[in-house]
A protein has these predicted regions:
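N-terminal cap/lid segment of alpha/beta-hydrolase-fold proteins
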Residues: 1-30
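Short, surface-exposed "cap/lid" segments of acyl-processing enzymes
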Residues: 24-66
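Catalytic histidine-centered segment of alpha/beta-hydrolase-like enzymes
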Residues: 77, 189-201
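Alpha/beta-hydrolase active-site loop
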Residues: 79-100
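Gly/Ala-rich beta-loop-alpha elbow adjacent to hydrolase catalytic centers
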Residues: 109-117
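Short beta-strand/loop motif that positions the catalytic acidic residue
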Residues: 148-149, 154-156, 160
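Acidic catalytic loop of the alpha/beta-hydrolase fold
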Residues: 158-163, 191-192
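Catalytic histidine neighborhood in serine/cysteine hydrolases
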Residues: 173-192
Length: 213
């Protein structure tokens, strides 16, 4: 049984359950919204990849906000196939606007969370940096990223079951024409980075620290 969130964000459909965490002893250098994988596959803000990603961002000096999308945990509403979830992402950004108005915002999403987070983050001027973990290029259309002009990190396992690495390399090459994009490939890692979570965390912390330097 996972603990309940320590924060509830009020939204049109009721509330979003969330966990807000400040960096430990490090000075606050920004904020990050961290988004979980597909709810119908059991994805929640307590997912191991999401937890490690948030920890990596905390280590880099960012306040992290993990939310449960609508219909997950104590969040109200029902799953909306990635449409209503876009508004959930915007609600997280609104929270940062109200509570951390002067801080730079990063969106970090895993799998389904990457899909909806990248779509909002590409066009929302409040977001400066993007991180996409386990980008499910075999499942969704990511052509909207061709309009991206922001620094973006893709972290992918070369054994990912939901995102062909060759297809992702092609996408990243196209994104690089307009944005500073990087692809970090973790050898022998599957979609959930089993046995490679420490490496995933290190990649995210290092890239984020460089963006904020």
């Amino acid at each position: 049984m996972y603990p309940a969130g320590n924060l509830f964000i009020q939204v049109a459909h009721g509330q979003l359950e969330a966990i807000l965490k400040e960096p430990g002893s490090a000075p606050v250098r920004g904020v990050a919204l961290v988004l979980h994988p597909h709810p119908l596959g059991g994805g929640t803000m307590h997912n191991k990849v999401v937890f490690r990603a948030a920890s990596a961002l905390n280590d880099a000096g960012l306040v992290t906000l993990r939310i449960n999308f609508r219909g997950v945990g104590q969040s109200t509403g029902t799953h909306d196939q990635g449409r209503g979830e876009l508004d959930d992402v915007r609600a997280g950004l609104d929270y940062f606007r109200d509570k951390y108005a002067d801080r730079r915002i990063t969106i970090c999403g895993f799998s389904f969370g990457a899909r909806v987070g990248l779509e909002v983050g590409t066009s929302d001027d409040r977001v400066l940096n993007l991180i996409s973990i386990g980008t499910p290029v075999d499942q969704y259309d990511f052509s909207f990223l061709l309009a991206c002009r922001k620094p973006i990190l893709f972290v992918h396992g070369d054994r990912d079951e939901f995102g062909n690495l060759g297809d992702l390399r092609s996408l990243v090459a196209q994104v690089k024409e307009n944005a500073p994009a990087e692809l970090a490939v973790i050898k022998n890692a599957d979609h959930f980075f089993e046995g490679h979570l420490d490496e995933l965390k290190r990649v995210i912390t290092d890239w984020t620290a460089r963006q904020l330097s």
